[in-house]
Amino acid sequence: MGRGKIVIRRIDNSTSRQVTFSKRRNGIFKKAKELAILCDAEVGLMIFSSTGRLYEYSSTSMKSVIDRYGKSKDEQQAVANPNSELKFWQREAASLRQQLHNLQENHRQLMGEDLSGLNVKELQSLENQLEISLRSVRTKKDHVLIDEIHELNRKGSLVHQENMELYKKISLIRQENAELYKKIYETEGPSEVNRDSPTPYNFAVIEKTNVPVQLGLSTLPQHSDAEQSTAPKLGLQLNP
């Protein structure tokens, strides 16, 4: 058998009434949520129980829904009555002018102007605002400086790594040159290396048996005064 038709009237039993209220409340909240999601609607729902307890649901925020409702209702009334519409926009313009005046006055006071009409309490409030603003500015400045320092440290680390890599490459090149020179020295002999090497001084060894060894500068054959004055040759001279 199907369910019988429920008569819509107040439930006298308090327990049954509370159970029905809880079930119906959850159901209507579920429907409101589905409506907001499926139809992209802004939904606001408020329910007061018989005991005065508030239950509410809003797809955005209840305050924005109520504000939108009040504004929409005023606009509808203004459209219905041209005189009311004119008064509405006049009030809006006056309110905006007042807000602009307040902002300009507050700005001048923050800049230290137009302070003659303020009492001690108002001056203290203005001082507190300035201190809060100054702390915010200093905090932001500190954060910016810290970020810049971190960035400079990062760049410094990169430069240091690049220098280390360059130093390793230079050391490797020097090692390769030393090995290459050693191979040439072993292949061609000391005489070939000394003859080909562009050293500014030449070492000569003169040997005689049973003769004391003395070190000195040996003079190469004299060709001309110009040649003799340029590039003296370093030699090992054995004198009798």
UniProtKB/Swiss-Prot annotation:
Ubiquitous. Keywords: DNA-binding, Nucleus, Transcription, Transcription regulation. Signal peptide: none annotated. One of its GO terms (cellular component) is nucleus. Residues 220-231 have a biased composition (Polar residues). Residues 220-240 are annotated as: Disordered. Residues 86-176 form the K-box domain. GO terms for biological process: positive regulation of transcription by RNA polymerase II; regulation of transcription by RNA polymerase II. One of its GO terms (molecular function) is DNA-binding transcription factor activity, RNA polymerase II-specific. Its main location: nucleus. SUPFAM superfamilies: SRF-like. Residues 1-61 form the MADS-box domain. PROSITE patterns: K_BOX (PS51297), MADS_BOX_1 (PS00350), MADS_BOX_2 (PS50066). It is found in: Nucleus. Probable transcription factor. PANTHER family: SERUM RESPONSE FACTOR HOMOLOG. This is MADS-box transcription factor 27. It comes from Oryza sativa subsp. japonica (Rice). The gene is MADS27.
